[in-house]
Structure formats: structure tokens, C-alpha cells
């Protein structure tokens, strides 16, 4: 029994009526057992068709219902769609409500939409030349670290975040461990080597999902690389990369980058490694097209 089915079954015991309010984000499934809004729809359609469903009319994207549709998922239930039920303003990135849409466009390979959104997000002030919500690009890790240090003030938190599949960042001196001391990473101060401030240990999508920091260095590895006009899915095991062909695993990997690109409250810088021609696991061609793709979108490089 799935978690949605279990909860609905429990609420279904009420003799008169009951309401379940679900706040479900799209594209947040990053591991086995996570199925998002689709699992709620399945539970209602297959086991509780007498329940009425009131939902947003904008849940048509792949990150919500895959290749299906709301009507197909809920063919046995009564459905009421309303634009007013779509929570489109991000409470995480309070300086720009378009950050999530920009992240979606990037990972979808939607260059045109990403290019259109980028200047609307950063909003450069003509008087001060400062960005409202900076999103930058670099191929120098030290430059990325210096940027987040310099732009933050007081107790504003910064750190490095990376995909759990970013195994070769180790060559740059950045470890992405399976487990970190989360409370120390997020809460401890600049005098603790285990805190995010030291930028030696990166938090993966599993550790930062549902949380956020003020400024982030988003390290973009070769696991989700842009190649010949589209993103490819890759896994590092042993001493080499291999393609990921399972559609479910591909979706988890894509969503991992969606999570990473939406964790910064006030801005972030994307670090794309240069690679190393003498290291077959860090071949520059694994990174160059991703970098060029982001440059073509217009992301400002420092």
C-alpha cells in the first residue's frame, strides 16, 4: 500500500465527510518509492473513486503526470480543475518567483524559455549594476567559492551542493558523501570544518531537498551532461562512466538537478569543471557542451 493510499484509506473511515489538502511539488521524486502527485491520483482512481478531486489546471507537464494526463489518471473520479489552486510563487527563492521555471527550462533542454527567463530573474539594476537574484557561471571552483563568500553577509549561509552522482568532483577536492552530519552542515558556524561554510563537503540532493541556503555553488558533474542538443544520463561506477537507460532512473537523475537549481534563496553560481585530458573519467568533452549550453542561454560567466 502506498503512502497516499494509506492516508486516504484512513480518512475514508469518517462517516460524514473529510478533506485532505496536499501540497505537492512537481519533479521532486529523486529515489525509489517516491511517486509524486501521480501516486495520489492512482490511489483515488483505483481505490477511492467516490472522492472528489480539486486540483490545479496547470499540472500538465511531464514533472507532474509524465506522458499521461490528469483526465487519464482520474478516469473514474470526479475532477474539478482550477487555476486558483496552482501555487506559482516560490517561497524559497523570495527574490524571484521565476527560479523554479528557469530550472525546469534548463534541465528540459528548453533553451528558448531559459534564455527568456534569465534576464527577468537576475534583474540588473542600471544604477548599481547589481543583480536582484544572481545566477552566474564559472569553470574555476576557487572563483565560485570566493563569489559566495564575498556576496554573503553576517549569518547568511552558503555552501557547495552537487548531485549524489558527482563522483569525480573528488579530483577538485570536493567530496559528495552518501551521509553527512546534516545538522552541522546547515547550522554550525564558520569555525567548524563540518559546516557548509568550509565548502569541502558538498550536500547532495538527498540532504538538501526541502531545505535551502542563501547562496550556493552548484557543481555540475558529468552524470547529467549536455550532448548534441540534449541531456544524457550517466552513472559512474568503478573507474568509468556508463549510460543510464532506465526511464525511471533517468527521471530521478533529472529531478536531482531540478532540486539543486532551486535550493538557493538569494542566488547561486554554477561550477562546470574543465575536466582533464589525462584523466579518462574527466574528459573535457563530458563538460564542455554543458558549459556551452549554459553560456548560450546567456548565463553570465565570471
Predicted stretch roles:
Residues 12-15, 148-155, 262:
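Flexible, charged surface loops at secondary-structure boundaries
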Residues 19, 201-302:
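C-terminal accessory regions
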Residues 15-21, 52:
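Loop/turn-to-beta-strand initiation segments
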Residues 1-7, 34-41, 67-71, 141-142, ...:
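Well-ordered, non-membrane alpha-helical segments in soluble/globular domains
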Residues 1-13, 200-204:
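Conserved RecA-like ASCE ATPase "motif II neighborhood" in helicase/translocase motors
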